[in-house]
Every structure is written in structure tokens, then in C-alpha cells.
Amino acid sequence: MRLRFILCLPLVMLVGCQSVQTTQGGNVGVNRTQYMMGGLSAEEVNQMADEAYQETLAEAKKQGLLNTNAATVRRLNTIAAELIKEVPHFRADASSWDWEVNLIKDDQLNASCAPGGKILFYSGIIDRLELSDDEIAQIMGHEIAHALREHGREAISRAYVTQMGTQLAGALFGLGEAGNQAAQMAVQYGLTLPNSRSNESEADLIGLELAARAGYNPQAAVSLWQKMQTASQGEPPAFMSTHPSSAGRIQALQAAAPQVQPLYEAAK
């Protein structure tokens, strides 16, 4: 009985969620139905994300690390402008978002696009990997795709219903601490991690198409992840990671490149 309930937790966790389609599928065919918590609006998530983004910028500015390289900032803004022109192919309302692009001087290999279009790059990912414009466009397109698909709101919804599901299991069946941990593990492997990995794969594909439509070479996605693979000191198994492995990512991007190559050729 307990095992049956644990295996059914992904269904229990859909209670209180609404099915949505945040984007069009595009040439790459990203059509997964998403589930969002009914009481959590995109506007609320965007506001929370913007507050966190502005706090990050304020701290970087205080330390003298914000937008210190004017040439790189211009480079990022130019690439962003080209990519943003293409977002209506996936989501029409995104063209009116309050987009913002900033650069923090920091050695980490990182970049992000917060919900609502707040793009942030760290200088380390550009300088240490010696990225071309095409490769920057792949990273930026990937991060923009997370925002278009509202993966942040989806993650918050998953976290909420995961907690709700495990608490319900404990309450109904008197599961002790070990039982609750087992339920959490079932939820994690049955719902949370697969969705997280699929989110990353979706962002790869949508980012690939955005960049191609903007005139950036899709083959740069492969060279980018080859550089990331070289820069990594090892990686967790793909099954346990919220990101696909570099090798798996490269293979998927190589398979998808022919779907967007005509878009790139037309945009050149």
C-alpha cells in the first residue's frame, strides 16, 4: 500500500496545478505541456526575479564589478537585441518585456536570464572560454529560452507540490522519518529531476533556433559545449544531474542542427 502511494505521488502532486503552453513549438518542436501552480502568476514570479536581479546588480556595483568592460557590454547588448527580435516566433508577448543586459566581472562560468527578460553574464564565461559571438548567442539563447518557457515558475510549482505530496504521504500513512525520506526520493526521481533535465534540453533547442533565426551559426552550440566539457573537471552522471551531460548535450545539439540550419542560412 505504501509503495503504491509513493509511486502515485507524481499524480497527487498535480493537484492545484494548471496545464499551460507557455510557448509555440518552433521548428525544434518543443511542445511539452507544463504544469503551474494555480495561485502563482507569471507577474509574481517576474517581480520576485527582478528584485533578486536588482540586488545582485547593486552588490556588484558596490564592489566595482558591474559593467566594467564597455566593449563587452556593447557586444552582449548587440547579440541580445538580435535574439530578442526573434522571440515572437516562440512567444509574442515577450517582445514587450522589460529586457535588460548586464555584465559582472567575475571568474565563474555562468550566465542567466531571469523571468521577465533580465540577462546577466559573468565575464569568466566569455574570457576563460574565449567565446565567439556565435557561442555567446548560444548561451544567451539558452538562458532566454528558460525565461520564455517560464521554467522558474514551473520549478517553484514543482517545489511546492513536492513538499505537499511528501507531507500528505506522511500524514495519511504515518510514515516515519525514513518513510518520508523514501517518499521524497520517489518524488525526486519520478518528477523533479526528469523535469529539470527536460527543461535544460528544451532551453538548448529553443536557444539553438533563436540563435539561428538571428543569424548565429548553430554549429557554435557544439563548439561551446566542447569548450565547457574541456573546462569541467568531471561531471556527475546524466541521470543524477539537472543538466544533460556535456556528451549527451553535444549529441542532441548535433541532431537538432539540421532543423535550424535553413533558418541560419536565410538570416545570414
Regions inferred by a protein language model and the residue ranges of each:
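Bacterial N-terminal signal peptides
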Residues: 6-15
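A Zn2+-metalloprotease active-site environment signal
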Residues: 2-4, 17-268
